[in-house]
């Protein structure tokens, strides 16, 4: 049993005692508990249990809690070494004289590597703990010039000579310190929020494995995980489990680009070898509220942004099917060939769901490829209560679904799902001989790299697969339902208050709640260009003050001819009603004098 030195107060109170018995009979239970902390967990708990026998309930609870807390803290910085009987334990290490060259694979570099990584784990665990602590700021904002000039020794400039591991650890801490805590319960700025602990563990393991997704031979488990997960996602969309295909991509914008490439290859496979000159003048259709990535893909793939035709939306941001059909007929009359329609399930700003069934009818009528961009709204497919909002998605030819948004998977995690098997392979396959040999000893259909436009592809699947295992489909359903309930709570809280105006009438379909804060100076004033101009400046001013204070973050933007408004989105499972209350109170506090 490890020894423990009695506290100074205990030593002082025993000044006249027999020195041979002073340490055997400490005057406080805390001293004995200190001895217990130096023991193994099992023996330490026995000592605490012995001390409890004659104590009050309050003292019993305090002793065991204190012991368990200190044991837990100690164990945070130790891990089982599967190859040895002992443990890795954190020891005092002078990192100022150690460098990257002293770590593995350096000879005798194991101990330094262990101590360095334990320090990094300590940094990460402190960051995780503070992220969920609401007394911690969401961000410690500094302007770009301040960070570039250096903050308290934090230097972004690269050096010619190696810096010590001590400086590297400082850089690790500072990088997190000056970043934004996107997992904080009061971060509402983006569609991707939260910090899932299982997902975090998966990402750590993914980085440690440091492999590539292009062939089964170097990523066998990850490739199988991806296929199983994509198959499950296609089934949830409503497609046959036997058919279809898919792949994880670097984000929703790339997934949407895949869908356009697949559509073009399906109808005009010669484009792969002969280029756009070999095909008619093709046009794409998407709503005026859709994600800008559709126009960006049009530019990148050679269609041109002028040939990405925007369809009018109603006041809730949904495609007007009649306008879609009219625009298709107009394009045909002008000699263009309509190719592709993008319907959005969860628009970025309003959270609107396009009427997929009606759009699918039009696509079938004119033989067009139907893609559903469900990057933001795809998570609702996991909810029996809300999946009806995507009714008709099973009729789509392709679907974008980003688990890193509504499902809370750590960035990045986006899937492109295709109804017809073989199109991705045919569209992108180049048969690079150094990777995709046909005479391997295993089934080469598991080599997925030739389906992708990339060569190297990051392992995005493991954290998602691990979260699904940990939560189950029901866990994701509960998580998504909770976020939508919080959006309903926010809407009900502000819809009838004079300090707020809703951007559109009616309850939101998704967790997007769009509203204006009306400062005292603008209340009761009739709508006019002058009032709209003043209102346009309110949200940016409040957002700037919000970032300076660091207490919370929420996004704002204009839409069409509407003045800047706040767009509140909820996808963080850690958020609660009290966080919604705090946000509203903070907006009022920061905006009351505008």
Swiss-Prot record:
Q: Which family does it belong to?
A: Belongs to the group II decarboxylase family.
Q: Under the GO molecular function aspect, what terms does this record hold? A: glutamate decarboxylase activity; identical protein binding; pyridoxal phosphate binding
- One Pfam family named in its UniProt record: Pyridoxal_deC
Keywords, sorted A to Z: Decarboxylase, Lyase, Neurotransmitter biosynthesis, Phosphoprotein, Pyridoxal phosphate
* Cofactor(s) listed: pyridoxal 5'-phosphate
Give the Phosphoserine positions (modified residues).
78
Cite the EC number: 4.1.1.15
Classification of source organism: Eukaryota, Metazoa, Chordata, Craniata, Vertebrata
Per the UniProt entry, what species is this protein from, by scientific name?
Answer: Canis lupus familiaris
Residue positions of the PTM N6-(pyridoxal phosphate)lysine? Answer: 405
Binding site residues for 4-aminobutanoate? 190-192, 567
- Please list the reactions this protein catalyses: L-glutamate + H(+) = 4-aminobutanoate + CO2
Q: Which residues form a coiled coil?
A: none
Question: What GO terms describe the biological role, i.e. biological process, of this protein?
Answer: gamma-aminobutyric acid biosynthetic process; glutamate catabolic process; locomotory exploration behavior; social behavior
Gene Ontology CC: one annotated term: inhibitory synapse
Protein name, please? Glutamate decarboxylase 1
**Enzymatic class:** lyase
Gene symbol of the encoding locus? GAD1
The record, for InterPro entries, names: PyrdxlP-dep_de-COase (IPR002129), PyrdxlP-dep_Trfase (IPR015424), PyrdxlP-dep_Trfase_major (IPR015421), Pyridoxal-P_BS (IPR021115)
Known function? Catalyzes the synthesis of the inhibitory neurotransmitter gamma-aminobutyric acid (GABA) with pyridoxal 5'-phosphate as cofactor.
Listed CDD domains: DOPA_deC_like
Q: Which residues cross the membrane?
A: none
What spans are recorded as compositionally biased (Low complexity)? 1-13
């Amino acid at each position: 049993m490890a020894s423990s030195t009695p506290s100074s107060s205990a030593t002082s109170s025993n000044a006249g005692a027999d020195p041979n018995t002073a340490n055997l009979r400490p005057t406080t239970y805390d001293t004995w508990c200190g001895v217990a902390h130096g023991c193994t967990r099992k023996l330490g708990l026995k000592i605490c249990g012995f001390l409890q026998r004659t104590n009050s309930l309050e003292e019993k609870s305090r002793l065991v809690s204190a012991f368990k807390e200190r044991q837990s803290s100690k164990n945070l910085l130790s891990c089982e070494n599967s190859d040895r009987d002992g443990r890795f334990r954190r020891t005092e290490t002078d990192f100022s004289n150690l460098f990257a060259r002293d770590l593995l694979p350096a000879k005798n570099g194991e101990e330094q590597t262990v101590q360095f990584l334990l320090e990094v784990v300590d940094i990460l665990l402190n960051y995780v703990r503070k992220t969920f602590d609401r007394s911690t700021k969401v961000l410690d904002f500094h302007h770009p010039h301040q960070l570039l000039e250096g903050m308290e020794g934090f230097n972004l400039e690269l050096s010619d000579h190696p810096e010590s591991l001590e400086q590297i650890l400082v850089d690790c801490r500072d990088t997190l310190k000056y970043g934004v805590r996107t997992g904080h319960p009061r971060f509402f700025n983006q569609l991707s929020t939260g910090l899932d602990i299982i997902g975090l563990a998966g990402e750590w393991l993914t980085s440690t494995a440091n492999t590539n997704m292009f062939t089964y031979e170097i990523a066998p488990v990850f490739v199988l995980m991806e296929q199983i997960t994509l198959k499950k996602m296609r089934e949830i969309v409503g497609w046959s489990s036997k058919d279809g295909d898919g792949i994880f991509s670097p984000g929703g914008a790339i997934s949407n680009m895949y869908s356009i490439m697949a559509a073009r290859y399906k109808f005009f496979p010669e484009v792969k070898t002969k280029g756009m000159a070999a095909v008619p003048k093709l046009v794409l259709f998407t709503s005026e509220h859709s994600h800008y990535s559709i126009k960006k893909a049009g530019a990148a793939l050679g269609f041109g942004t002028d040939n990405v035709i925007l369809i009018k939306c109603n006041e809730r941001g949904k495609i007007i099917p009649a306008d879609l059909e009219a625009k298709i007929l107009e394009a045909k009359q002008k000699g263009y060939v309509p190719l592709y329609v993008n319907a959005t399930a969860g628009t970025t700003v309003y959270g609107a769901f396009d009427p997929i069934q009606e759009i699918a009818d039009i696509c079938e009528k004119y033989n067009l490829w139907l893609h559903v961009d469900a990057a933001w709204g795809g998570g609702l497919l996991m909810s029996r209560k809300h999946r009806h909002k995507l009714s008709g998605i099973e009729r789509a030819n392709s679907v974008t679904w980003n688990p890193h948004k509504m499902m809370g998977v750590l960035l990045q995690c986006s899937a492109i799902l295709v109804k017809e098997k073989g199109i991705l392979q045919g569209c992108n396959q180049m048969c690079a001989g150094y990777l995709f040999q046909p005479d391997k000893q295993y089934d080469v259909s598991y080599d997925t790299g030739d389906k992708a436009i990339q060569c190297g592809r990051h392992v995005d699947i493991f954290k998602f697969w691990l979260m699904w295992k940990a939560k189950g489909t029901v866990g994701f359903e509960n998580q998504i339902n909770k976020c939508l309930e919080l959006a309903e709570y926010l809407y009900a809280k502000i819809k009838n208050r004079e300090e707020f105006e809703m951007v559109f009438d009616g309850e939101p379909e998704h967790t997007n709640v769009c509203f204006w804060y009306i400062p005292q100076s603008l209340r009761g004033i009739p709508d006019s260009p002058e009032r709209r101009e003043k209102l346009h400046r309110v949200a940016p001013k409040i957002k700037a003050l919000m970032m300076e204070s660091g207490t919370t973050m929420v996004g704002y933007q204009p839409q069409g001819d509407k003045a800047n408004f706040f767009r509140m989105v909820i996808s963080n499972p850690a958020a609660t009603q009290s966080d919604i209350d705090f946000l509203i109170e903070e907006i009022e506090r920061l905006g009351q004098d505008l």
